[in-house]
Amino acid sequence: MITSITLLFSILWAQILSWISISGPLILFGLYYGFSITLPMGPSQILSIRAFLLEGNLSGLMALGGSTLGQLIILISIFYSPLYIMLLKPHAITLITLPYVLFYWYEIKDLSDYQPLRPITSLNDTGIIQIFLNSFLFQIFNPILLPSPVLTRLVKLFLFRYSHNSFFVISLFCGWLGGNILLINLSKFLLIRIKNNSSTLYLLVKRLIYRTFSIIIFVACLSYLGKFPVPFSMKKSSDESSLNEWKAERLSWLYKPWPTSLFNYRKWNRPLRYIENSRFSNKSPVKRNVSQYFFDVCLNDGRQRISFTSLPSFSIFEKNLKNYLNVSRISSSSDVFYQEWINTKKEQKDDLYSEVEERIKALDNGFSLEHAIEKRIGFSSINKEDIPNKTYDPFLDGEFRGKVAVSQSPLLLTGKSYGLTKTQKLLHLSRKNNKLKFWISNKWRKLERKDLPLPWEPLTQDARRVLILLIKGLRNKKSKIDSQRNDFSKEQGVIALNEENISPEFSAKTNNTNFLREKAIRKSHINWELVLNLSLRQRILYFNYLEKVKWETIKNSWKDLISGNFTEVKNIGSLVMKIMKIHQESPLQEFHKEVPRWTSKLKNDKFDVIAIGVTDIRQRKVRNLGYLIKGREKRRKIVRRFSQQSDFRRKLIKGSMRARRRKTLIWKILQFKTHSPFFLKITEKPALFRSTEIMEDIDVKGTFLNTIGIEKLISLLSERGVAIKGTKADRLAIANRWDFPLAQWGRSWLLIIQSYLRKYVVLPILIILKNISRLFLLQVPEWNEDWNEWSEEIHIKCTYDGTEVSERELPEQWLRDGLQIKIIYPFHLKPWHNSKFKEKGNRNMEPNFPHTQNKGKETSDNKAYRLQKNKKFKYSFLTAWGFQTNLPFGNIKKQPSFWKPVIKELKKRWKREILSKTANFYELYYNISLLYRKSDISNRFKIFAEFDIQTDERMNHEISKIQVNSESGGASVTDDGIKRESPLGITLNSENSNFSENEDFLWEIPVESRYKTAKNIKKLESLVVSKNNLT
């Protein structure tokens, strides 16, 4: 008896410590997972915070109440499987959650007025109910923003595992409640801080918060799209010869059960790639088949064993954890790391061995078997008299339970069992062996699915009769068709089937036929399982024929009824039901499911394979894929271009999870290209530092000092080649800049519009204006010539690379891949056609020689052929702005000017008509002036000669210079008289200086020399004047 209070407290404290030591880890786990229930921030928690900030404390508490109620229902559903399946079925959540979130975002995306920003102060407000329901439904749908739902699954797993432990349940509830209280307090604290510390009006702050949360909800929608399973249809190869099978495969998804009709259960989770070293043979050092399982070391019974179902993520995490904890320093070998667990298992095994050894020793010492063998716990009650027999004790099994003695004497058999016939015994045994089938059948009927028979149920009378007719028809057809080509004719084992018995007189040549024969012999009726074993084509034929027979039966019954045969009046109800259900799908349902099997040879070639929809691995994006036929042999050449854009799907196995792909890290909000994490440091380094490092490796001083060598090097390079390379690089850069879907879409439409406007709008208008203006200028119009040249212009649609496709048809995927438009013989508007002018000029310039006259007699046909043969092939590419280039994305081609020939012709006529007349007038004036000064010039030359003799030395020196100049100009003095030549070759004779004899000598002088002659005469006159002044 406890007499001291301290002793009482010490006992209680010891019990509490023992409870804590026993259930301490569970309490900690419960608190942790209770807090972690509210840790994954989903839309429900976001709505709660939004309600606190925008609509006050009351609406925030109601939103948090809805979230809490949703969490509570989810936790309770763990212990009730129908509710758990209804709430957490992934495919149903996929189809419900996303539309609901999008609808909610559409409601809150725009703020029409400030009414939603007012605080809610009453529970009677309709907005309270709306907030509560939205928060509750978002929590029920259970979407979270974390990339992996492992945390929430661990909570459910631990709660289900330790639900019998009150400490864990209480601690989990306390942690969950504490997490929600913490969320409430943090939301209120955030609300107070925003109200007190905002520099602007709180109403404007609310507007910003409203807009921010609408963006957050939209981002949550996008994140759900990446995490939810997406409907994915597997492509199946169909045989062109079997059209019926192809149709059945196309409609097979209608007959699949939910959710396999929309969702792909064959989707890869952790796909593997097989890399081949040789493209032409399978003989490579790499093993041919790769396992789809991951092998790793695990512990089992105290030993390390190889497990083939290990998770790669767990193995990688374990290795990283060992490296982080530096296990090699703690223990020299990996065995010591698990030594404690191995020792525990070894102790348990040793205890078991020692216990068995002691029991054997007890038997040797004379103890009975009952005392030596371990006593089993039995079923009993308080009254020892009510202890049941060991035969009926449910806690005992094996040898401890009594055996019911079964007498082998036929005298103990009942009359009923003794009088059974052989057939009844077989039927009794079949029923005994098929208890499971009977139980399933009874449950199936209770579920009100009587119209859907089970595989072992017999066929109806109509179905049996149709099957017999069908098989007989196929047997008759077999005698006409070769047996090797008809697969269905091999299954002749069901030919002699009647309504009650099946005759085994048929040949079994295939496994399927053997199975049917065994079923027919073993059972006395035809069931739906026999129909299930038919091929797909045979089943479709059977059910179509069965439907036709139903219609015929209904028609015949109504005909009998109308004709007066009232024997079928009692079956009118069944006939109406048949008419109502005639178009329903077949009542046959297959009780089998295909196991997802993936190929173990996913080949990853070294080169990019051009195969759209054939390979299992996504290859590089191909643009402008087509075929080009060249040569006389008409060989098909593949024309393709790989996209220059970064491909985020390249080398990704179709249907696999995108988040599992390595080496495509995305660390920016908007990232244009994919990068490997290995090169992150290089790509993030600024270009300035990289350029300085490159410049440090170059000898800058030597490069700039040795300028002569650089000039020689540049001179050796071909300027033309450098220009071609530069333009090609520029064109490729422009093409890559345009190579993304939105730009290709806009550019392609612009090209088509420009082509149409040029061909049918702009050029016809210019031709009409030109010829009308020629009519106003009293010139002959050139309608035929212009329209002929316009009709020669052809617009050919090409791919983005410039490969010609067709004049009328557009390339495939032209909106996505882009296109080019090539103009052959582009039309240029001319002011006149040069053929007429050339003919006129040739007629005037050609002399009248006999051989030239014969040439002029060339026929018009030969002339047209010669012109067509000598015609140069011209083409250009149209740009999106209407210009022309020689190559795609090349420099703009300079077009011939329309006004330049006109201006040139006007200049020629100006010189010929006006300037020639003014030159003639000037020459006439010049000749008259020469005649007037003829005598005066000769007398002045004589005065110069006399003056040269009488002047002093200084003047003689000057005169000698003048004479030298006159001699250099071609003048000479003779004794007979003064005879001088002008610098232009004009002879002036003093004795015979009659200009009338040589009136046309000036016409022989060139035009330029006439102006020089006038200048020399002026200089000569100025010299004479200066000498006269000196004298």
UniProtKB/Swiss-Prot annotation:
Primary residence: plastid
Annotated keywords: Chloroplast, Membrane, Plastid, Plastid inner membrane, Protein transport, Transmembrane, Transmembrane helix, Transport
GO annotation, biological process: protein transport
Keyword Metal-binding: no
Transmembrane segments: 11-31, 68-88, 92-112, 127-147, 166-186, 212-232
Keyword Ribonucleoprotein: no
Membrane topology (UniProt): Multi-pass membrane protein
Localization terms from the record: Plastid, Chloroplast inner membrane
GO CC annotations on file: chloroplast inner membrane
Known role: Involved in protein precursor import into chloroplasts. May be part of an intermediate translocation complex acting as a protein-conducting channel at the inner envelope.
Subunit text: Part of the Tic complex.
Family the UniProt entry places it in: Belongs to the TIC214 family.
Protein name according to UniProt: Putative protein TIC 214 N-terminal part
Source organism (scientific name): Anthoceros angustus
